[in-house]
């Protein structure tokens, strides 16, 4: 089991917008991710999640798990490389323990962040597999 400490910070929306903060953190030079809470039942969400300077990038190439690891603590995960994507992703998540720095954090802070490309749906929905070739399923 690999334990990672996640860090978070609450900021007042009076001084920064999520987009301005995201741009200042990434400076258009490093990859980053901005997730915004959705409007539900007429109420705006409370959280914006910004992730940047990733320790690891997980990709799906030809329906197989591909890892780009930038942190030596995660080196043992490299053995998952080449596994069928969903099996590899499950194994990866079982080997990680994400610990938050404050129990008052937003519920989503102890998580892995990212996205799945449209074609990756075929890996989750077998009925779509005939319509979308595995070689197109990348995330």
Question: Predicted regions span which residues?
Answer:
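Signature of the chorismate-utilizing enzyme
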Residues: 1-139
């Amino acid at each position: 089991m690999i334990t990672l400490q996640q860090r978070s910070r609450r900021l007042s929306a009076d001084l920064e917008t999520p987009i301005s903060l995201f741009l200042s953190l990434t400076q258009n030079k490093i990859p980053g991710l901005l997730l915004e809470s959705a409007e539900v039942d007429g109420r705006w969400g409370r959280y914006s999640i910004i992730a940047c300077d990733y320790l690891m990038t997980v990709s799906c190439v030809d329906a197989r798990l591909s890892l780009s690891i930038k942190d030596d603590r995660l080196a043992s995960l490299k053995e998952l490389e080449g596994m069928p994507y969903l099996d590899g992703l499950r194994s990866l998540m079982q080997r990680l323990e994400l610990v938050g720095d404050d129990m008052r954090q937003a519920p989503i802070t102890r998580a892995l962040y990212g996205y799945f490309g449209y074609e990756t749906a075929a890996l989750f929905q077998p009925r779509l597999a005939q319509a979308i070739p595995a070689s197109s399923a990348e995330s």
